[in-house]
Amino acid sequence: MKILKPYMRNTSILYYLCFLLNSHFLTEAGIHVFILGCVSVGLPKTEANWIDVRYDLEKIESLIQFIHIDTTLYTDSDFHPSCKVTAMNCFLLELQVILHEYSNMTLNETVRNVLYLANSTLSSNKNVIESGCKECEELEERNFTEFLQSFIHIVQMFINTS
């Protein structure tokens, strides 16, 4: 199972550092190192999670062979590279439909992980304004298999540019 918060992987190292510096708290330098160490625990890492997103999407692809998903989702199959953030936001909104319509625990857990990883990685691009892009509702509705193929394609574009 994937870690839902991959940027928290190395926090235990900082805790050990804090305990190590415990004997040096009486010095001003020790206090500064301790405070900076504690502050850095809350800062997210900037590493891209797109490879993990692609892995989870491929896992969903294998899961749907055993689960009958009869839904159509707005799918941007021919998006322009200058609209990739807008297209990704549409894919993420549509993926939430699966959470609401299907109750398979493994599927929902994987979908939640995709949403979390993609949103946390995309958060730095949330305020990007891309002009001339289609709204989500203007996109063509496709079945879930085609939706996943297009989703994997756009994630691959993010991997190639990071």
UniProtKB/Swiss-Prot annotation:
Gene3D superfamilies (UniProt xref): Interleukin-15/Interleukin-21
Signal sequence coordinates: 1-29
Coiled-coil blocks: none
Biological process according to GO: angiogenesis; cell maturation; cellular response to vitamin D; extrathymic T cell selection; hyaluronan metabolic process; immune response; interleukin-15-mediated signaling pathway; lymph node development
Intrachain S-S bonds: 83-133, 90-136
Superkingdom of this protein's organism: Eukaryota
Classification via Pfam families: IL15 (PF02372)
MF GO annotations: cytokine activity; cytokine receptor binding
Compartment list: Secreted
GO CC aspect terms: cell surface; cytoplasm; extracellular space
Propeptide: 30-48
Keywords attached to this entry: Cytokine, Disulfide bond, Glycoprotein, Secreted, Signal
Residues bearing attached sugar chains per UniProt: 10, 104, 108, 119, 143
Family membership noted in the UniProt record: Belongs to the IL-15/IL-21 family.
Function: Cytokine that stimulates the proliferation of T-lymphocytes. Stimulation by IL15 requires interaction of IL15 with components of the IL2 receptor, including IL2RB and probably IL2RG but not IL2RA. In neutrophils, stimulates phagocytosis probably by signaling through the IL15 receptor, composed of the subunits IL15RA, IL2RB and IL2RG, which results in kinase SYK activation.
Protein name in the entry: Interleukin-15
Species assigned in the record: Rattus norvegicus
Taxon lineage: Eukaryota, Metazoa, Chordata, Craniata, Vertebrata
